[in-house]
Structure formats: structure tokens, C-alpha cells
């Protein structure tokens, strides 16, 4: 009856013993908690076709689970941009909840690795619990993430199976709905149709994050948005998870999802335990998919995701020693089809278990997401102690590297070695590299002389032990903003309590110090050091493999902050900055008889003070020439504010709150001055929202510029000069000089939603700028005295207006026509470049003669010799020599001597053309002045101060 001995029944005595043992064990295990299921709460199961739960419903449900389950605690972690409360569910066993504060402290101590011996770390790792962060819904239209989180929390609060109970005992789960505003917006939009079959996520009328939409996953080192700040605080200051899992959509065509491991390159600054830890966690996911009979998971070459870039929710974790997991899965409450793609049916290393083409329902995607969640929780449970200890090791390694001479080997290092070898070979008359037999590059199995290896470790090229941000730089308030960005990401920053000397240089009290000897050293390095992205091509002469996001982003460069790299260990009168800080109060140097006050144009926050003055009806003048008063020289661009009680009150507050120095003068300056005045600023936007416009919107609000949004129908109505002084157009707003029938950019969302289906409040946003109707009206606006600021691809207005600029990034095709340079010849993805400036030009006043600009395959021009005679003046340009500062520039020679920012006179008005990303994601504070100056200089009148 039982031919297979594996299935033979156990003896009766053994069964009785096991029954007693299980009974005793049951007394010690938490009972299955009686909690409300999603179906009982909402009337449908999570993943049912045509059904969604919005954020308001999610919070109400989680509050109920919090009351019903002793496994869950619901906490508030911040507010959203629209004012909703962000929540986080903390799920673990009741016994762990009783010691939650202790386990949180254990995770923090291991993550920071400060003053902790190896034995002490092992003891804490044995005591602690693995902390796993799982979020959902960051990109709200990728609706699977938020919905699966509801299912996961219910299963973890109700499950009584052995695996769930083990996980609850070993792991603390942090479950976070990452975009509450977006979830309410998208779910409500989808459900607005009474007829389920008509429901669609297409055509959402606004961005699903108030300002930046999809870019909310590009904000995790800058922390500009309240949601990002809240999550960064939990990740890097409060909880320090060892693993974070960031759900996204959608999967590559013909698959169900992409899951790690990722393709190369990974970043050279983070710990090797990051990529191998990723492999460990990823293997558990793929193993579970296959074991559960869930085909369709691809990895590595299956999609373009990598671990190079810092700035996403998942990717910023790597630079904080967290294993960050991303999945991109298919699925929609409206059923979809997995298409038949023949090549996808063939198994391979990166796609071992193909999925058949089929109709796909949302519930299937929910189950896949839960499988991925459980795989991560399971591996965290089984390797609990290892994950905790490895987090300590990564922090310890970072501290050690920052405490001694160390070198980060990057592609440029290897290129220098190869160049040295090649040079010596040529001098010796040896064959050129690659000509010899065996090995790569002709080096053979024996490699090359070790002297080349030893040359890598030149003392002058070592990594810094730390960075000093001097307090006496012109725009110290912006430097303080950089420091706050670091602090919000968990970086330890110190401040000098007295003046001090390091490496032969004196620094004043109040200077900031960032030591490299800290656990988050990888993050520190990417904020101050240039990125050196490899030349990434599939084969010699082939097109470049695009990086997942930016290739270079060094934040200190982007923000224009002065800092010194300190190569040797140093100390001084330093104290830790305990949290986000303000710049020291500025000086208000004005006696009762002062005629007025000078403000420094080099300081970005001066624009806040000017905007407050103008809003209050006070006057301000922008001096066209330098001026000497009371023994002090004030450069061209200085702001002069005539004395009045109102102006004094505003400027005293600005000095205190913003750190501005307000310098009084006994007499008023003389000479020419621009007169900034309250302006009517229109910022282009479109139905569905523009992220580029949203970033400008956010930026204008931070610096207190007045503005209103303007949509295509309002532009087409004409009469623009009566409504606006300044119009701002961002990338995606202006159509190319058209080939007939070619669609303009900027219409995301509308195509799938007929006008009859658009709510009345949004109908005035429908439409697009056209060459036939809108462009002539824009020209009339400028000719009548208006000002246009055109950013990125909107600079094609120059071509529409017939201005004498030519595209610098073209070559002659064989048929004699111009064609854009192919990426095999020229390719500069998101990188920082060094540019020259004419600081005497009003558009550039307050800037130095050289600046760093963010360039992302953006426009560049050449000017004919008579351009200035025709009213076109260069303001910022690329010089000869090396341009790349951080990132990847293939064929950068094509950019040399090209114009990056220009002013053009058109009739009585002006158009300013900005090729680089001068406001990119709220990061390049060093180029904000180009935008702000344009807003005030464009329509300003010139007067003579006497």
C-alpha cells in the first residue's frame, strides 16, 4: 500500500509525541489574528477586475487593522505636498512590538557602525531583527504597487502559517504608501466611470505629484518634496532597513516583470556587499517565482535598469549600504494582454522561465507582487543575522576607507594606465596594444609590469578624508542648503565653533565640515566627487547603451558651492550639526540716517528679498555698473533699496531668516540702473501636466516669484501683451519646425481622453501650441515688448522666429543636407559640463566667469559673425579644452565653442534661450540666477539714478 518508503506512515508513538510537541508549540506562537479582510472591507478582493482602493480608503482600512491586530502599528511619518498625512505600517510579532524601540536602536547602531567592535556588532546582530522596507504607489499610475501593499499588510496581520509566523518573529516590516496624493487622484479618476468596462487610467488631467509627477522617484538625494523628506527620514535617520523594495510598473513586453539582478555598470563607490547582496535577495525572488509556477520574470539584460545612478528611492539606498530592490511588473485593473513576441519564448540565463501570451488579469499581478514580497521577507528572515551584520560591515568598511589613504579606481584610471603602457611600448618599438597574441588588449596572460599598477596610487589622486565648506563664500545660504540636503539623507556634518587651519589654509568660524569617515561615505562621495561613467557600448563603433538616468550629478558642482577637498586626516574645533539648520543671521549694517541698502546679487536668496519688497510696494534698483560707497566696492548687479520703514522691516527679517547681509549707505548710488517691478509671469503648462513646468512652478514658489499657469487655449486667444510681461516655456512645449503631420511634444494624457470626457474645470487646458496659430502670437508678444524665456527644446522658438543661430550638433549627410550627429559620434547623457560666462551681461550678473551646467543632450548653437549686429548675444558658451566635469561625454569636441545661453532682441522685446538644464529637478542652484535674472531683466526699464 505504501511502496515508496518516503510516504510510509510514522509509528503511532512518534505521532503522539509530535502531537504533544505541536500543542506545546502552539501555546508559544501568536494565534491567527481575527482581522477584517479586504473583501469584507471594500466588497471586493484586491486585484478584482475594474476595482481599486484609494488612499482615503486604504488609511481607514489600516486604522481598522491597527485596532484589530497586535502585529501592526500605524504611524504618521509626514505630510504630502497637498496636505495629506503619510502613514507607515510597522508589522512584526507582538513580542517584537514590545521591544520595538530597542530593535530600532540596534538597526541604527549597526548601520552607522560608530564605536562598535566586531564582537559587539555580532552580538547586536544576534539580538536584532531584520528591517525590511516595502513601498508601493510612488508612481501612482503604476497602480499595482499601492494595491499589493494592501494585500500584503492584510496577509501579514492575519496569516497563521509557519512561514508568516517565522517572518513576524525575525523581521520588522515597514509598509509605506509612497504617494498618497497620487493614489487618491488616480484611483478616483479610474473609478469615475460607472460602467466598469469603460474605466481607464489614461488622461489623468494633472501630475500625480503636485509639482513633479514621475520625477518623485528622481528626488531622493535632493529631497525637495515633503514626501521625499518624510521617506528619507525613515530610511536614513530613523529605521535604517537592511533591504528596501520599491514596486514599479510596467514589465518589458512579452514578460510579466523585470526583477534584479541589474545590468552593469554598478557604481564604483559603494561596497561590494551591495551587488552580492542584491544577487542573494534577487535569487530568492526568482527561485520563488519558478517554484510557485509563476513564469515570465526577466533580469539583467532584460531591461535597462542598473545601479549606477544615485537619486531614486531604490538607488539612493545603495549609497547608504541598503540592498535596494526594484521590480517592474505588468498589470492593470482593466485586463491586458501579454503579446506574442517570438524571441521571448526562448529561455536564456536572464529569462529562464518564459510566459505564454495570454489575457492577463490584475489579480495575477497581485499574486506575483506578493510572491516577490514574501521572497524578500523570507530571505531576510532566514539570513536575519547575516543581513544585520553585513550592514555593519559596510559601514565599518566606509569608515575605514575614510580614515586612511584610499583610492577609487574608475574608468579614467584604467585609461591612464593603458595610455602609459601604450606610450612605453611605442617608445620601445613594441607592437601596438591589441596586436600581440593572447589576453585582452595584447597584454597576454602575464599582464603588464606592476610599475603601472603602483603608479595608480599617487598620493595626489587619493580620495579625500573630508570636505570643508568655507563660511566666507559669497553665497553661504546656498551652501547651507547643500548641508541640509546632506543631513536629510543621514550624512553627519560638523560645524566649526571657531576659526581653524587645515592644510595651510585658514577657515572662519561657522564653516561646515563633512568627514569621509562615516558609514554613508559612498553617498558623500557622489555629492562632492565627479562621476566617471564608463564608455558603455554593445560593440566597438556601436550606439551607446544609455544610462538608466543621469551619468553625472555631483551636487556640490550643480549647486555652485565652494568647497575644499582635504586629502590628509584633520581635526579642529568642530561640533556635530544636530539637524537641518539655518544659515547664520546676516548683518544688517544700517544706521538711522541711511539713504538705503545694498544687497549682494551673488546670493540666490537675494531674489526672495527683492520679491518681498516689490510685493509690499517698495522700490529696488539693479545697478548696471559697480559703485563705491562708504569705502566699500559694490559690483555691477548689486541691488539698491531706497530707505523706508517698510523696506527696513523686510530686510531686517531677510537678514535674520535668510542670512543675507544688508549693507546701509549714507548716500544713494548714481548711474544707470534697471528697475525690477512686480511682474505678470506666465508659465506654460498642458493638460496632463508637464514635469518640466512643474519643477519651474516649484522653484518659482521657493523664491517667491508671482506667476500663473498659461495653457495653449489662452495663448491662442491672443492679447498676450495685455496679460503678461514674461512667458516661460519649458522642454516639450514648442513644436519643432514641422514636417507636415508630425505631432508636437507636450500632450501627454490627452490623446486617449476625448474632450467630452474631460471634467469642465480642465477643458481650458486642452490643446497644444501650433506653428500656424500660436507661434505668430508669441512673436507679436515679443515684438510689442514682452519677454520669453525658452528652456531646453523650447529654444526651437529661435528657429520659428528666424533668429541667426545654427544647430552646433549636426553634420553634412552624403546628400549635402544637414543631419543630427549620430549617438555613435556624439552622446552626452545627463552630465555636468564646465562653461564660460560673460558676467557683465545682465542675464549672468551674480555668476562667476566659469560655471558648471547640467547638459543632457540638450541644444547647442553656433552664431554667425554678424549675430550681434542682428541682436543676438552669447551669454554662456563652451570653451576649448576639457568640458566634462562629471558623467559621460562621448564626442565632447563637438560642443567646443558652442553657445549655451543667448539673448536675442526681437522688436521691442527679448527672448532668452537656455540650452542647458538650468533648473534641472531643483538641483542646479548654481544656474538658477540665469532664470531669475531673465525674469526681471527682460521687461525692466533703465533709469538714471541721480
Language model features with spans:
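Short, solvent-exposed turn/loop segments enriched in Gly/Ser/Thr/Pro and often Arg
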Residues: 175-180, 190, 246-254, 794
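N-terminal secretory signal peptides that target proteins for export/translocation
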Residues: 1-11
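Ala/Thr-enriched low-complexity intrinsically disordered regions
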Residues: 10-13, 435
